[in-house]
Amino acid sequence: MAAAMMNKTIVVSKDGCARSSSIPKVATNKMGFASAVAMKKSREMMVWQPFNNKMFETFSYLPPLTDEQISKQVDYILANSWTPCLEFAASDQAYAGNENCIRMGPVASTYQDNRYWTMWKLPMFGCTDGSQVLSEIQACTKAFPDAYIRLVCFDANRQVQISGFLVHRPPTATDYRLPADRQV
């Protein structure tokens, strides 16, 4: 019993419930040294870099999407009968902050973070051709090359935003880090 308890730890979650979980064991060789797999996993558990490492919605942890990857996402959006919509924001207005958030009393939860981006034209209601969405992305990028541009999609049945991801990041943006540089 005591040996079994040594490999367990008690974790208290945010809801106050205590849960027992196993402590992962490090694989060692005959000499007692950690294996290469264990060393690789220990490098994966590093401290998150809090500076110049901001994220935007879906896929923010990935490198910027290529045109082909954006095209596949657009096809997926249209295949699900969702309504695509383009939005853009200047670099200084793209992230949530006290300067650019609307505060209506102590708590304002009318939108995700009370920060609105400017809509590019109207939502593309009834759009079934992905090339139309891609041409609007190109037009918006041409009109606002120094702005963040994101594609969001809405489900009319559930009346919610389903997804949102960046399709253009300003060339002068310094807030993105490669995945290898996101940890210390």
Swiss-Prot record:
Family affiliation: Belongs to the RuBisCO small chain family.
GO terms for MF: ribulose-bisphosphate carboxylase activity
Miscellaneous remark of the record: The basic functional RuBisCO is composed of a large chain homodimer in a 'head-to-tail' conformation. In form I RuBisCO this homodimer is arranged in a barrel-like tetramer with the small subunits forming a tetrameric 'cap' on each end of the 'barrel'.
GO biological process, one term: photorespiration
Transit peptide, residue positions per record: 1-43
Signal peptide per UniProt: none
UniProt protein name: Ribulose bisphosphate carboxylase small subunit, chloroplastic 5
